[in-house]
Amino acid sequence: MTISGGNQHNNNANRKYEKLIKQPQMQFGSSVTGTQTDVDSCRDADADANAVRQDFSNFNKHFGNGHAITDRTMLLRLEDDVTTAAGIVTYKGKSNGNGNGNGNGSIGSISLDFNGSPTSSTSIGIASGSSSNTHLASGGGVGGIGGSEPAGWMCHCCNLIARRCFGINVRRCVLALLAITMVSIFYYTHYVDTGVFNGLIQRDTHPAPIINCRMINSGGKHIRNASPAPDHRSEARLRIDPKVLVFVETTYSGLGRDIAELLVYNRIKYKIEVAGKSLPVLTNLDKGRYGVIVFENLDKYLNMDKWNRELLDKYCREYSVGIVGFVSPSEETLVGAQLRDFPLFVNTNLRLRDASLNPLSSVLRLTRAGETAWGALPGDDWAVFQHNHSTYEPVEWAQRNTQEYPADSVGQVQLPLTTVLQDRGQLDGIQRVLFGSSLRFWLHRLVFLDALSYLSHGQLSLNLERMILVDIDDIFVGEKGTRLRPDDVRALIATQKNIAAMVPGFRFNLGFSGKYYHHGTREENLGDDFLLQNVQEFNWFSHMWKHQQPHLYDNLTLLMAEMHLNYAFAVDHNIPTDSGYSISPHHSGVYPAHELLYMAWKKVWNVKVTSTEEYPHLRPARLRRGFIHRNIMVLPRQTCGLFTHTMYIDRYPGGRDKLDESIQGGELFQTIVYNPINIFMTHMSNYGSDRLALYTFQSVIKFLQCWTNLKLASAPPVQLAEMYFRLHPEEVDPVWGNPCDDVRHKKIWSKTKNCDSLPKFLVIGPQKTGTTALYTFLSMHGSIASNIASPETFEEVQFFNGNNYYRGLDWYMDFFPSESLPNTSSPMPTQLGSPRFMFEKSATYFDGEAVPKRSHALLPHAKIVTILISPAKRAYSWYQHQRSHGDVIANNYSFYQVITASDSAPRALKDLRNRCLNPGKYAQHLEHWLAYYPAQQLHIIDGEQLRLNPIDVMNELQRFLKIQPLLDYSNHLRYDVKKGFYCQAVSEKRNKCLGKSKGRQYPAMDERSAKLLQRYYLNHNTALVKLLKKLGSRPIPQWLKDDLSTGT
């Protein structure tokens, strides 16, 4: 049956065949007047009318279902003939608006077979009127459903709906049909594994690697035995430091930034200088400070003033230091322009294509010649070099872009144009490598690294060994339709074998969550089984049982219980449990460190190694580092451009070209080039569907073999971690950052932790300068609170400067209560819940070598408060402090013996000497703090003024800290005659002073020691005066003036 709505009237009525046919009206109350058209043949109107009556009777039986009981009539007007063909009668008519609704006179048609059954090809169109009831053919059509021959339960439902559709409200009918449609979609996508529908899913679009090298066969082996990469090392490297001096046009120039980032990525030390200024110091005693000089703009070198040019050239000749220069783009196009003082000519502002390398160049080491980078090169501002002297040799060639510059004649052969040039130094004794374009072209990045190696005589050479490990996270985790099938597992094994031929020892590393085993479709469950049947083919590591984030657990027992479930699953399915490696879902709990995770890992899995992309931050990738915490080595993890949702090549963000760009010289390629040890994160979904991970890693490894001399290999995680920390021992200690400063970190940090409780300012010492008195005065303020006292170090936490730092951030934060807690020791009333200024006082922070870096990482916005007194007086006070506490060395050696102890003295004596003398090098330590904190966050207190006039000192400190309300210390501090210093006034007649150990009177320092210390600190005190003047906000203390006047 077909019922459809139209919007036109048939005015070609043949009135002589018009009849009225009464039929019981359908329940929904619509009256239909039909107009018959499309006449084939019909001569007897009465016979046709009878046929119509019979058909409508059958129609009402089918769709009225006994409910068409109203007295209204269906009026059918026969105009022209009734079409009858193949047992089907078709009526096309228009509504006359009879019934309860307001008909709009739309054309309608009804098709029935003579048996009263719907035709095998069924479509239903429904029109609605404007009244509360709905009518057949009473307005614009609003919906429909089409289908083919009924099959199974779905078609049965459709027939049932069709038969009852005219016995209920049409709007409900539409909703029912939509519901059936949604149910059918859900059924087919979640429960049907085979058949026509499943075949519609694109599963045969697996991209194949297209990287082909002329020098490498299909098995990843070089066709001819390639000569080993040249060794640039020579004895000249012994006279220079492994550091690069980079001259830039401005501190914000783009190429200068690219150069600096490339050096950072490869951990090459460098110094940036703005060209045009005076040269920095180039030598240190008899050694050159820099191994290579780099000019972002070659013109800055060529046009350097005579004095600086001669100094620089003399340094380069004397220490065999080379120069790298880049031809800077300019608006003026040069043709055959000669470089100043050199028999060298340049053409600029060219568009080029098809770059290749000179296989005879002695510069190349990391980079392999023999291939061509086909296609247009980036940019339209290339410079090419022309020369006629034997000192010059091309390193890189390119062709003119014929699309931009057509050849003069058809078939003309273009000569290669030199885009990177080596100057052997035959003219002036200085070797150079000149680039005709920036680092936008990926090949220039490799050649630039080779130039640094060559010009520094191997001092800046990179190791050519690269380790690659590919983790496959989320095994058994994934929605239906995204998981692995048996064919995917076979492809995984086959690809692993192919990669292993190019990367010795390579095996995929699979991380599993056992809870979701057999949670796919039937075929995907077979894939799970097939994966476990081949468990021996891979390396394995544990995720969490249900892929939970560990930082959400505050109970160690529960966290361990979840791990035990995954462990039991591994045992039941013969998965190895001794890898010593684990990955936390979403890297939760690794960094920021969740201490319970590290504890549970050790107890359940005996984890020795993990990895994360979050330390210290996800971006920029060049700054990712490793660390060791609780004897678990944490390695930096790399991304490869594939994530859980990137499963199909045609849906890859940016398209296939974007992925290929990353592989062929882009981000993924450069990640492996720059990192000696690479652990890549992928997911199970990347190995199903289009198997993008297999395509990606096969392609990038082949591309690496085409263009580099890198030696690729793989090893288990524990072995990689040991190698990593041998290469980078400076990364063993972690640096705890503030989780609230990184949105990603905050998401994987416990919700029970709050950065607001961290201290807003630090009192850093040094020791024996009055820090305890300052601590006491600050605690009197109602809006200021300090940490909870430590059972070991009392009011000092001593977190940033000792072994406490390795206990982790959680341990440190436990010392700081909620900032809303009242300060019960304060005489100043405070309201519960008012803002609090938390602070920490640890006098050992001042001269701690690692303290400024560590504190700035966690508390970058904190204010820093320090107290300075005469360094000689401070040294003597520390010695007497140790004597009073029964220190054996202090009681057995005089002060003079201690401060004059040699480096060959007993270790304990040297330690005491250092603790007496080193903190007094004030300028040196302050400069260290100012390397991390701006001067605006540093407040220096004159220790003598704190002792003699604490009220003014405390008022000034409150203004610096911007604390409200201000506390009037004149009402709370009183000079105590017996103690000889100010104390807290608790009543009119009683003071609360520090203990007996504070303010102790010592014997006067002997004159010999005093003179020695005045000479010892002379240069340090002079530097302090210069620093204070530079800061400009502090007057020169009187004790400093006295020390300098006496010393002279």
Swiss-Prot record:
Gene Ontology MF term list: deacetylase activity; heparan sulfate N-deacetylase activity; heparan sulfate N-sulfotransferase activity
Catalysed reactions, semicolon-separated: alpha-D-glucosaminyl-[heparan sulfate](n) + 3'-phosphoadenylyl sulfate = N-sulfo-alpha-D-glucosaminyl-[heparan sulfate](n) + adenosine 3',5'-bisphosphate + 2 H(+)
Superkingdom of the source species: Eukaryota
Ranges annotated as spanning the membrane: 173-192
Glycan attachment residues as annotated in the record: 388, 555, 823, 892
Topological domain spans for side Lumenal: 193-1048
Record membrane topology: Single-pass type II membrane protein
All ranges on the Cytoplasmic side of the membrane: 1-172
This protein's record includes keyword Disulfide bond: yes
Subcellular location as annotated: Golgi apparatus membrane
EC number: 2.8.2.8, 3.-.-.-, 2.8.2.-
Disulphide-bonded residues: 983-993
Keywords for the protein's UniProt record, in alphabetical order: Disulfide bond, Glycoprotein, Golgi apparatus, Hydrolase, Membrane, Multifunctional enzyme, Signal-anchor, Transferase, Transmembrane, Transmembrane helix, Wnt signaling pathway
GO biological process: epithelial cell migration, open tracheal system; fibroblast growth factor receptor signaling pathway; glycosaminoglycan biosynthetic process; heparan sulfate proteoglycan biosynthetic process; heparin proteoglycan biosynthetic process; imaginal disc-derived wing margin morphogenesis; imaginal disc-derived wing vein specification; mesoderm migration involved in gastrulation
Pfam families: HSNSD-CE, HSNSD_N, Sulfotransfer_1
Region of interest: Heparan sulfate N-sulfotransferase: 753-1048
Keyword Chloroplast on entry: no
Pathway participation: Glycan metabolism; heparan sulfate biosynthesis; Glycan metabolism; heparin biosynthesis
Recorded family membership: Belongs to the sulfotransferase 1 family. NDST subfamily.
Subunit comment: Monomer.
Protein name in the entry: Bifunctional heparan sulfate N-deacetylase/N-sulfotransferase
Gene for this chain: sfl
